[in-house]
């Protein structure tokens, strides 16, 4: 693992547990066990580090969500939360804390949101055999985002509820009683 990847991998859990705005550079250099000079040399400032962390997390997240059905999508989301923790959407938290004053962070969050929308559209099209209408896509996206948020206080029950609701929506859309 190169030093840049090492710093990013050590910074992510610090941001996840403590927030973006509240986390100082001293805490980040301690977590990565590097000097501030090394951190700045490889990643620039805090905003660049946050963007690199968001990009790495986005890649890992979408690798996990490389599935072909809506049911598998919610199963993958639950697996992600069990592995990574259920503290709500990392990207939404970054946007709320930093996006308003850091355009680079806002751009990372926007890229994530666009990719999530595209991924869900692809999975839905695979399930339906055709592109989903915008309403159904938005409904599945709301269930996905809602489960992500709700899992922070309801645990796995949030994923079961979202998965069940998504199955009902698909059944109603396709006219199948069991799917």
Task: Describe each PLM feature range.
Residues 6, 48, 72, 76, ...:
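Amphipathic alpha-helical interaction segments
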Residues 6, 10-48, 52:
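Helix-turn-helix
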Residues 8, 71, 114-121, 125, ...:
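An amphipathic alpha-helix signature
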Residues 10-17, 64, 143-150:
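Solvent-exposed, amphipathic alpha-helical segments
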Residues 52, 62-87, 136-140:
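Hydrophobic alpha-helical connector segments
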Residues 54, 58, 106-117:
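Amphipathic, non-transmembrane alpha-helical scaffold segments
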Residues 83-107:
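Amphipathic alpha-helical segments used for helix-helix packing
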Residues 104-110, 126-179:
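Hydrophobic/aromatic-rich alpha-helical bundle segments in the mid-to-C-terminal region
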């Amino acid at each position: 693992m190169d030093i840049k990847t090492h710093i990013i991998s050590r910074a992510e859990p610090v941001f996840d547990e403590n927030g973006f705005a509240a986390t100082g550079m001293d805490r980040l250099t301690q977590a990565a066990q590097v000097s501030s000079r090394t951190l700045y040399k490889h990643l620039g400032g805090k905003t660049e580090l946050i963007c690199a962390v968001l990009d790495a997390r986005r890649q890992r997240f979408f690798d996990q969500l490389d599935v072909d059905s809506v049911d598998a999508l919610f199963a993958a989301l639950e697996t992600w939360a069990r592995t990574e923790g259920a503290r709500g959407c990392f990207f939404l938290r970054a946007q709320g804390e930093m996006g308003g004053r850091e355009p680079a962070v806002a751009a990372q969050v926007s890229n994530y949101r666009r990719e999530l929308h595209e991924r869900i559209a692809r999975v839905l099209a695979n399930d339906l055999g055709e592109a989903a209408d915008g309403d159904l896509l938005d409904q599945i996206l709301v269930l996905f985002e809602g489960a992500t948020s709700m899992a922070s206080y309801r645990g796995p029950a949030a994923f079961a509820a979202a998965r069940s609701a998504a199955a009902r929506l698909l059944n109603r859309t396709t006219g199948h009683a069991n799917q």
